[in-house]
Regions:
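Macromolecular interaction modules
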Residues: 1-103
Length: 103
């Protein structure tokens, strides 16, 4: 099991949502999963929240090291396909968190 969780949250305008999900699932995630030390990615859409301003989408990446998301390999894979040009510019309210497994 991975020692770290890299959590990415973001919003996307409604008119870009279908492309966002298609490109995330068919290009972005498969590309990132080729990065050494990335074990898995699971995506979620917000169902409810008790505070305002929570991003709509969340991705959980199980990773072996906290340095992986800033690595050259991650950046190169993240920039492949349509993600960097067609989706990333339309995202907002982005958060990036890394948690270390306890125990």
């Amino acid at each position: 099991m991975a020692a770290y969780l890299y959590i990415v949250q973001m919003d996307i305008p409604a008119d870009k949502e279908a492309d966002f999900n298609r490109i995330y699932d068919t290009q972005h995630v498969p590309n990132i999963l080729t990065v050494p030390g990335v074990e898995s990615c699971t995506r979620f859409k917000l169902e409810s929240a008790d505070v305002d301003g929570i991003p709509t989408y969340l991705a959980l990446y199980a990773i072996d090291s906290p340095d992986i998301p800033q690595s050259g390999a991650w950046i190169a894979e993240s920039d492949k396909g349509d993600w960097a040009s067609q989706i990333r510019p339309h995202t907002s309210n982005r958060t990036h968190l890394i948690f270390k497994k306890v125990g």
